[in-house]
A protein has these predicted regions:
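Hydrophobic ligand-binding cavity/cleft-lining segments
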Residues: 1-70, 77
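Structured surface interface patches that mediate subunit assembly and partner/cofactor docking
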Residues: 6-11, 45-51, 55, 90, ...
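Intrinsic-disorder/low-complexity, polar/charged segments enriched in Ser/Thr/Lys/Arg/Asp/Glu/Gln
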Residues: 12-20, 88, 100-102, 113-117
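Hydrophobic pocket/interface hotspot
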Residues: 28-32, 80, 118, 155
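Short, intrinsically disordered, mixed-charge
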Residues: 33-37, 145, 157-160
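Hydrophobic-ligand binding "helix-grip"
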Residues: 69-112, 136, 149
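Beta-strand/loop substructures that line and gate deep hydrophobic ligand-binding cavities in soluble
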Residues: 98-144, 155
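Well-ordered alpha/beta subsegment
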Residues: 149-152, 156-157
Length: 161
């Protein structure tokens, strides 16, 4: 069982991506904690589109270039739900009335290197919230998937450097 399973055992929306990294778990964990938005290919472009080109205060949709992206997230709307070095990090946020999200990075040692997964889960408390979020998810999920895959690649570059 993962900490994500403990934090969000039920959900209606889910996205999962993985990558193999030739590094030890602690090095990968440190890379996850250190990656900045400018290291994630297309991050700034896709979040600019998501926010409609508006300038917003610093946050996950408007991350600066100097801080690790997880620090930006947890200093604004996200909170750490679990931090289990060097195995798993889970952060979560309240998106809107009746809608909560959690995401993790899970490091699983393998024969050579590690498998690193990131998963997002969203729970909507009632049918109205589910319908509202389903439309939003339909629109943002492709960009979200691109960001997650690029985020994993940025972690890999850092960990294998």
């Amino acid at each position: 069982m993962t900490h994500l399973d403990e934090a969000m055992p039920r959900w209606q929306f889910r996205e999962r991506h993985e990558i193999h990294i030739n590094a030890d778990p602690q090095r990968i964990y440190d890379a996850i904690r250190a990656v900045r938005a400018d290291e994630i290919t297309l991050f700034r472009t896709l979040t600019w589109i998501r926010r409609g080109g508006r300038n917003l205060p610093e946050g996950i949709l408007n991350a600066g270039k100097t801080k690790p992206i997880l620090d930006v997230a947890t200093e604004t709307t996200f909170r750490y739900l679990a931090d289990d070095p060097p195995r798993e990090i889970v952060v979560g946020t309240h998106i809107a009335r009746g809608i909560d999200a959690a995401m993790n990075f899970l490091i699983t040692p393998e024969a050579s290197g590690c498998r690193v997964t990131t998963e997002t889960r969203v729970f909507a408390a009632d049918a109205k919230a589910r319908r509202r979020f389903a439309l939003y998810w339909f629109v943002i999920r492709p960009g979200s998937g691109i960001i997650r895959r690029m985020w994993l690649r940025a972690v890999k570059r850092r960990a294998q450097a």
